[in-house]
C-alpha cells in the first residue's frame, strides 16, 4: 500500500524534471533496531523496485532517527536537501511532526507517515500528508475473537477448571498507540 501511495504521490511533488525519469524516495524510520520496521522498510524497497520501468527509475534512500526526534528531523532535512520527491516517515514521536511537516511543505514534498499515526490535527495541516497503517482497534477485536474461538474449542486451556482463563497480556512497544488500542 505504501509503495502504491509513493507512486501516486510522486505526481504531487513540486519537482517536475526529475520525477519524469527518476523518483527519489526518502524513508526515515524511528529506529534501525526494530525488526518489524526493518521488515516493512525492506518490503517497501522490494515493492518500489518492482514498480520500476523504462520510463521511471526509483531510488530509495533510508535513514534512521535512532530513537531521537531531533535526529530524525535532521535526517528528514538531509533527505529533502538530497532531492527526495516523496518522504515516507515512521515517526519517533507521533506528537511532534510539526517541523517535518513544515520542511516538507516548504519544498512541496508529499509525506506518507507509516506505522505511527500523527495526531489528527497534524495530519490536517496540509493536503499532502498521509498515513498508512492498520486499524489497531479492529486488530485487537480480531485477536480476541481468535483467542475466544481457540478457548471454546479447547476446554483443556482452563487448567484449573474454574471457568476462567488466566493469561498474561503482552502489550508490545510501550506507548505505541496501536499497541495500546489493540490491548
Predicted features and spans:
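Sec-dependent N-terminal signal peptides of Gram-positive bacterial secreted proteins and lipoproteins
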Residues: 1-12
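A residue-level marker of the well-folded mature domains of exported/periplasmic proteins
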Residues: 12-183
